[in-house]
Amino acid sequence: MTQQTDTTFEVGTQLEPAPGRHGRTGVIHTPHGSIQTPAFIPVATKATVKTLTPEQIRSTGAQAILSNAYHLYLQPGPDIVDEAGGVAAFENWHGPTYTDSGGFQVMSLGVGFKKVLAMDTAGLTEGDIRAANKDRMARVDDDGVDFKSVIDGSSHRFTPEVSMQIQHQLGADIMFAFDELTTLIDTRGYQEHSVERTRRWARRCLIEHDRLTEVRADKPLQSLWGVVQGAQYEDPVSYTHLTL
């Protein structure tokens, strides 16, 4: 049986307390090594950092890498990564790994640029927004997201449970709860509704994560982290932070 090791965080130095001063250093201890924080984490979308070998990535000082559940779900498939021994073995990376939930890609690639809109929204009209929504490839409801593959247009559905199942097969040390991506053009009312949805999804993720941890007891322990949402509104952001 594989040795089980929890992921833990140890605080190092902290700035002197003052309004707006919350900086600190620390160490994240994972089953596959430690990460000194703050840290730059390269993105290996499809289990590879494009143009770089694992040795070259390590030579940059990178301590961990992050891969994407959405893209690995579509190609080559989480079952293949699982059979290879998990995402670290699959990409020949000897160190800590992260996977994101796939939520960002499901919604951003499905809805198009309006879902990942930049800060400047001054040039948009209601007609622009309606036109973008007509052709979007993702639909969100309280249970999950229906979307079409960017590869072949096939239909798929992600729920919190599906995201956890995929990420457990990918086997990263740290994974993220499935959350809803919103935009700066969404109303405050929608942002607040979305925050509640993200909280409910996080609880469902935790329940499924606990179940899969028992089912896959021969695998290294994986740590589940939440995602703070609320866009540019301070109260929803604080609420998410305090309740996740």
Predicted regions, residues:
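Active-site glycine- and acidic-residue-rich loops that bind
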Residues: 229-237
